């Protein structure tokens, strides 16, 4: 059985940063994730997608953010159970927990932090009868490596941020980019909508609104998409393509976590955000996109903040008789479990009394 101080379910950015905040408090951590590598969606779905709202990083690729977090937490030597899904939660008489995965791996900890992002997730697929026949043969629901689309004819379907952002990005990569949306209005960020409109005027993106992709054609690989216009006079058109990317978001599923007795609201875990992001089960916390409370913002930086607050509460729960005195890392440095220590260089600027 694996024993630790804080058992973190979910190894996305929020889960990884929890390791750092716990490490500053000398708390050991272990992470469980169903994916085969750390990083969550940032690694699995869009490692090459730029992120613009991480403090001090005007722009950083999602995969690079994960790499930086892994380097930041390395001194605290976290444990990982990867490729396994947290299946059951058992509360013991002493208030601690045993979490067992779908492969039977058992973990014991006094504190459990659910940082599973959206939980398990599946792409929302358009109702095209033969779409499964072309998956990985021209149809993709995620963009992991934009270079795959270099000099290709690409059709993107969707009207949200992902569809807009990837249309903008692939305009510099693909030979042709068409963005198909069933409405005339888009639901994404205003600057993204404006940028797509600018690129459309320059002929670098073709915007096809009030239309839907309703069919796919090809022998072994995708060769054409069938686009149906709401304007019956235009009817249907057959467009030659190399790749079709429907981006209709993810369908979040809490999976087995949903049966742990947690208070759930709209497929998210309710927490007490006035104090420490604890759930209705004492000792079980939920941080990051998986939780919900009034005013919740599903941002990576929000997850980082929640992780810091949660770890302070976890420390008091594990050591109720100890009082932790907050020390800034600029003063106390960062002392890892591997014996390393990072600290500011101390220099004498002026001797006292001289």
UniProtKB/Swiss-Prot annotation:
Enzyme Commission code(s) on record = 1.18.1.2
The alphabetized UniProt keywords are: FAD, Flavoprotein, NADP, Oxidoreductase
Task: Please verify whether the record's keywords include Flavoprotein.
Answer: yes
- Name the top EC class: oxidoreductase
What's the record's note on cofactor binding?
Answer: Binds 1 FAD per subunit.
Is NADP tagged as a keyword? Answer: yes
Kindly list the GO molecular function terms attached to this UniProt entry. ferredoxin-NADP+ reductase activity; flavin adenine dinucleotide binding; NADP binding
Any Pfam family the entry gives: Pyr_redox_2
Question: Which residues take part in binding FAD?
Answer: 14, 33, 41, 46, 86, 121, 289, 330
Write down the required cofactor(s): FAD
Cited InterPro entries = FAD/NAD-bd_sf (IPR036188), FAD/NAD-binding_dom (IPR023753), Fd--NADP_Rdtase_type_2 (IPR022890), Ferredoxin-NADP_redctase_2 (IPR050097)
> Membrane spanning segments where?
none
| Catalysis: reaction(s) | 2 reduced [2Fe-2S]-[ferredoxin] + NADP(+) + H(+) = 2 oxidized [2Fe-2S]-[ferredoxin] + NADPH
Cross-referenced PANTHER family, in alphabetical order?
THIOREDOXIN REDUCTASE 1-RELATED-RELATED (PTHR48105)
**Oligomeric form and interacting partners:** Homodimer.
Q: Which family does it belong to?
A: Belongs to the ferredoxin--NADP reductase type 2 family.
Q: What name does UniProt use for this protein?
A: Ferredoxin--NADP reductase 2
